[in-house]
Amino acid sequence: MEKYIILILSYVIGSIPFSLIIAKINGINLREVGSGNIGATNVARTGNKRLAVLALFLDSLKGFVAVYTAQQFCDNNDLYIYVSAILAVLGHMFPIWLRFNGGKGVATTLGVLIALNISIALAFVFVWLIVFFIFRYSSLASLAATAAAVIASFFFQKELFLILLTVAILIFLKHYKNIANLLQGRERKFL
């Protein structure tokens, strides 16, 4: 029974819209700024770097907390840990509090990766930074980092492959407009 509670908790934790809350406290409506997304990247588009870093930290932290909590109650490699990881990301993407209209799940995925395998998390961050600084597209960096995490799972922890592939599919689906804009040369660079 407690494992089912952990799964529900993972979704609920993932559903906390920290970026939206932080922005609102500071008089910013993220739905009306930049891309309209409620994630940390859109907080960065407001020009407030301090808020952006805080949003990134808190959105990542909720992914970490959800998985870490599951790890405390489950055996290593227990399916419940992996399902809690997916549910935390789904919570961010489809939060119950916002009529299931949330962010894209990238920062929350980083937190999940830190809890599951730090080597994969580092590969994720490394690829994100490299792609971002070369191309200046947050969306492209996020997609590349997500793909890199799936590939890295082959080298560092094969049992994470299907979980990370599932998360990657979700992230790619949430980025479908960005992908179309990238292909058409209309995606906005992050300056």
From Swiss-Prot:
Enzymatic class: transferase
Keywords per UniProt: Cell membrane, Lipid biosynthesis, Lipid metabolism, Membrane, Phospholipid biosynthesis, Phospholipid metabolism, Transferase, Transmembrane, Transmembrane helix
UniProt xrefs under SMART domains: G3P_acyltransf
Recorded metabolic or biological pathway in which this protein acts: Lipid metabolism; phospholipid metabolism
Catalytic reaction equation(s): an acyl phosphate + sn-glycerol 3-phosphate = a 1-acyl-sn-glycero-3-phosphate + phosphate
GO annotation terms (biological process): phospholipid biosynthetic process
Similarity comment: Belongs to the PlsY family.
Function per UniProt: Catalyzes the transfer of an acyl group from acyl-phosphate (acyl-PO(4)) to glycerol-3-phosphate (G3P) to form lysophosphatidic acid (LPA). This enzyme utilizes acyl-phosphate as fatty acyl donor, but not acyl-CoA or acyl-ACP.
HAMAP family assigned: PlsY
Protein name per UniProt: Glycerol-3-phosphate acyltransferase
Source organism (scientific name): Wolbachia pipientis subsp. Culex pipiens (strain wPip)
Upper classification of the organism: Bacteria, Pseudomonadati, Pseudomonadota, Alphaproteobacteria, Rickettsiales
